[in-house]
Amino acid sequence: MQSNKLRMAIRSTAAVAILGVAAQAQAVSFETGGYQTDIYGYARLNASYDIDSNQALSTRSGSYSGLVNNDDAADGHFGADAFQSRIGVKTVSPEGVKINVEGDFRGGGGGSLRLRHAYGEYNGVLMGQTWSNFTSFVGNTSTLDFDSLPGVAGYQSRTTQARYTTGPLSLSLEDPQSSFVTAPANAAQKDSLPALTARLQDSAGGLSYSAALLAHQVGYDTGSEDESAMGFATFVAAKIALSDMITVQGSLSYTDGANSYLYRSGENFGAASAYVDPASGDVETISGYGGTVGAGFNLGGGRSINVGYGIVEVDWDDAEDDGVAVAGQSESNSAVMANYQWTPVKNVMMGVEYAFLKRENVSGDDGDASRILFAAQYNF
């Protein structure tokens, strides 16, 4: 049965691959009144075949929601979309002020325009929305899955912020991200302070590395009760080139009261950061950790193979001991992803990827799924 499913998956992705032929797009760059402007982006097709239960999100990335107890779920699901496609504008003024606005089509669950970047930068000071400073791609293994491996370094998303960068050091004040286990606490959840981050990122020879810290407040205010606690997060990430052909990379993360920054923990993109003790009303933080390891192999001729593993674990023991209902919460999310990518002509990338996703809840219930992803991307 499993071999039949795999054959169906291969046939489906091969059929899509035949369609992956298009002309190369042209970049748009021009100067007006001393402003240097670039229009950039790409068109991208993502197609997936879920060998087991249907775990596809928009952009056909894999989801951990609904993965537990999926043994009896319908299997063999194909789908495709172009929601990852994006377009952006960058301009630099004669005085050196940089402005960037970019969007894609993953908004509203897929198909609507979504703002990715909108910021200005001058003399190391950046204000607006862009990648959180508590993010690094240094230790990431290249994946076709848009949402990638659990446990990669930091928030891995964009947020509004004020950032200052000098050399390899960046400091920022950011829109904070947090949630509670229970709905009543979430309804009264309150952010009184921005998240504070510091990141060091540099390289030396064949080694690239990054380390970061984050602190924020987690609290609630019902009008009659007002409680809060401090949450913290940290990560380290590195990549080393063993030769012209081989790189090895990975990351380690730890959070306590900041699981929104523990990538792909919980249902999909961040477990609860805290809970309210039913007896005292105090805010109690929840800790977690994660990590990734991977390797990339450059085969030459625009071809590469990439293999990565990632896992996140959340510690719900204290919440469970205090009588909070957490049996259905995800305790562990993990994934293996392996892909082959090639560039048939300049600015065109195609690839195929196998992924194995696994989740285990606090209750001990678990589930897993295999899936195959095909991608074709045309840059301009």
Predicted segment positions?
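Outer membrane beta-barrel
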Residues: V28-S61, S65-S179, K190-L193, T197, ...
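Outer-membrane beta-barrel translocator domains and adjoining extracellular loop/strand segments
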Residues: S53-S58, R106-L115, V138-D145, Q177-S192, ...
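Transmembrane beta-strand segments that form the barrel wall of outer-membrane beta-barrel proteins
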Residues: G96-G107, L169-D175, Y209-Q217, S304-E313, ...
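Cleavable N-terminal export/targeting peptides
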Residues: M1-F30
